[in-house]
From Swiss-Prot:
<keyword id="KW-0378">Hydrolase</keyword>
<dbReference type="GO" id="GO:0006808">
    <property type="term" value="P:regulation of nitrogen utilization"/>
</dbReference>
<dbReference type="InterPro" id="IPR043519">
    <property type="entry name" value="NT_sf"/>
</dbReference>
<feature type="domain" description="ACT 2">
    <location>
        <begin position="785"/>
        <end position="852"/>
    </location>
</feature>
<dbReference type="InterPro" id="IPR013546">
    <property type="entry name" value="PII_UdlTrfase/GS_AdlTrfase"/>
</dbReference>
<keyword id="KW-0548">Nucleotidyltransferase</keyword>
<dbReference type="Pfam" id="PF08335">
    <property type="entry name" value="GlnD_UR_UTase"/>
</dbReference>
<dbReference type="Pfam" id="PF01966">
    <property type="entry name" value="HD"/>
</dbReference>
<keyword id="KW-0677">Repeat</keyword>
<dbReference type="InterPro" id="IPR002912">
    <property type="entry name" value="ACT_dom"/>
</dbReference>
<feature type="domain" description="HD">
    <location>
        <begin position="436"/>
        <end position="558"/>
    </location>
</feature>
<dbReference type="GO" id="GO:0008773">
    <property type="term" value="F:[protein-PII] uridylyltransferase activity"/>
</dbReference>
<dbReference type="InterPro" id="IPR006674">
    <property type="entry name" value="HD_domain"/>
</dbReference>
<comment type="function">
    <text>Modifies, by uridylylation and deuridylylation, the PII regulatory proteins (GlnB and homologs), in response to the nitrogen status of the cell that GlnD senses through the glutamine level. Under low glutamine levels, catalyzes the conversion of the PII proteins and UTP to PII-UMP and PPi, while under higher glutamine levels, GlnD hydrolyzes PII-UMP to PII and UMP (deuridylylation). Thus, controls uridylylation state and activity of the PII proteins, and plays an important role in the regulation of nitrogen assimilation and metabolism.</text>
</comment>
<dbReference type="InterPro" id="IPR003607">
    <property type="entry name" value="HD/PDEase_dom"/>
</dbReference>
<dbReference type="GO" id="GO:0008081">
    <property type="term" value="F:phosphoric diester hydrolase activity"/>
</dbReference>
<feature type="region of interest" description="Uridylyl-removing">
    <location>
        <begin position="319"/>
        <end position="672"/>
    </location>
</feature>
Amino acid sequence: MPANLSSALETFKQQRDAAEAHYLKANRVSVFFREYTAAVETLLAALWAEYFQNSALCLMAVGGFGRGELYPCSDVDLAVVSPAPLSDGIQEQIARFVQTLWDCKLMPSVKSGSVDELCESVRNDITGDTAFLEARFLFGNRQTADKLAEKMNAQRNVAAFVEAKLVEMEHRHAKSQGSGAVLEPNIKSCPGGLRDIHTLLWIAKAQGLATDLPDLLKQRILTRAEAGMLSHGYRRLAHIRIHLHLNAKRAEDRLLFDLQPQVAESMGYEGLNLRRQSEELMRVFYRAIKTVKQLSGILTPMLRSRVSSAPMRVTLRIDDDYIQVNNQIAARHTDIFFRRPEHIFKIVEIMQQRNDITALEPQTLRAWWGATRKINRSFYQNSENRHRFAGFFRNGNGLTQTLRFLNLYGVLGRYLPAWEKIVGLLQHDLFHIYPVDDHILTVVRNVRRLALDMHSHELPYASALMQSFEKQDILYLAAFFHDIAKGRGGDHAIQGIADARQFAADHFLTGEESDLLAWLVENHLLMSAVAQKEDIQDPDVLDAFCKRVQTHERLSALYLLTISDIRGTNPKLWNAWRASLLESLFHAAGRYLTGNGGNPHTLFGRRRQEAADLLTRAAVPEKQQKKLWNALGSAYFARHQSREILWHAANLVHDFETPIVRSRILFKSDSFQVMVFMPNGPRLFARLCRIFSRHGFDILAARAFITEHDYILDTFIVQIPSQHAPEDYPDIQSALEAELNSFIHGHTVAETQSHSRRISRRSRYMPIAPSITITPEEDYPDWYSVEITAVNRPFLLADMAEVFFAHNVSLRYAKISTLDERAEDSFTVFSLDLKNPKIQSSLKQTLLEQLS
């Protein structure tokens, strides 16, 4: 590199570093863009003079560089423009110029060609056309630059350009779905991200309007309030993107888990632990994109209508205040929302009641939104407003869209201050993937779908139950309030009771309705906790659950709310196994509440009799049956449900001395049930768990049982890896049975060591602190319940079993609750030593070491 260029490069580095230092000190986005853009232009000036002095070419900044929005590691978008086709010599010179840019670490993105060639290249390329919309002359022949701009503008079909940009935005939003896009969003391309702001400005500029927000305000495209909010949202997002680049030291636009704490810290979220810093950063981010989405919903249709040929206008009278224009509702006088604030809810009520109205007309939406910022205590205390708000839930029709609309435009938070506290609040707990407000509205949607016959195919039984449930509006409200107290510290289920009861009192619910609502909010986690963590075949567990529930109405409501909550937390959580657990508990509790639960001795006797009847029908002699029951022992019937007993008995009755393995695919499920019967020995349970983990199975539940003649009868529910199709299941089943058969007949099976385990990036950078509780079982001396919460990983259950074995603790039952990347496991164990506090403390410490 020539000496003069080396000097220019050194000057650039100094100016770049100064721009970054000034930014980190003053925290002003516009100053950083101005200083960094100037630094790049200074370097380009030296390079241009070196390669193209006195040339007919010109250099133009395009794209982000053209609009002066250059981030620390962004591409530098350039165009080298010639009045005539490029000769071979000029092309070689341009190639050397571009290579020098790379040598300077500028990451150039360069288009080159004649005016005609460049115009032709973007004729059917919306991305290229958009880049040249931002074109800005830098150096060289200005006449060539002016000619290019003139020809580009002349060939651009503005209406087609606007439509193409809106379609592009729709496709971009569609790609930003799924848990990854929510948890690690792309700050540029996500809905409400920087690219949406750019799209608004491009649409305006293509129409010959202003190129920045202050000018759009002067041209009355934006109101002062809208310009202020959009500027604020833009600055928030730009700050985050600058810090992302500086911390990642690359052009990284995703808020990755490993970068979130670094960005949060560098942005000044001090005095909080790393997780809280990250949550606060994400909350700022979600609120910023929400602002952009609000304004985009208002401005996009207004800008579009300026150039698009509107469909034939069909106007219908609704009442004295409103008309219907095609599929939109419009106010006859847009100041109605300021003069008569009760119309803030009335227009939404009309939209909810009429299926042929899907939106507010843009000018009406703008006026309505402006008025909503005046919602205050007086508005809340107005009984007409309260009746209408409660009516949204009683009506049910279009409830999800109504609540999402009100949330998007900030109305829910202004009407209910408790709601405002959860907007954008993300929980780094390894299984929630949505901000709390989005999660709640997804749960409301799930409850509502159960009430609609068109969705009955998804969950037929739950849908039928919901469609016959009398108090559907209370169930919608329970979904709305179940997590409203998140983020306050303490038990959100308990804290939410006061919010629910206050709402009920203010919105004319009866005492009975208020009681049901408050009970559901308080107990919304009860059914999932019992079904997933406890042995629902244990009569004591069922008895305790039913004492909390008490009525069939509560049971049905809790069942429907629980299903909807799990499905709305994370798509990965809902599966056939969880569905079967909840349904089994629902039916068992229903029988109990009807008086058909029976006492434990009757229940165990009935289980044994059902198995005996099956064997008798299969012509198994009574004497042979009795031998089997004696070998299994009386405790067997207390620890297994009827379906398991029938399955075990059919496979063991003819020979309960020979080791066997059996498996079956559970009905309508992606899971196997596996039984292993063999002579007892050391570490068998742990070694079996390792076999399942090595095959990629998730262990959903496990029951370890030792017979009277010292055989193990272990039963597992394992989930098939998600990448396998149902047609693969028989082959997977055969391969698993073959390895298990080798194991039970004494053939050595290589054991995979747990140190090879892998966990996700989310688990690495947003881990949860492991916790362990050990509680003695009432009425059962030397039996203990062990509860473990930790980051989920392969071989976790096997490692826990190894620890139990090393401490002379006999594992009898394991209930595995895997919540995406979070494991909440419950174990029932037997030990003569755990009553000693030192031994119990030693067990806890060893378990924590395995979990950390």
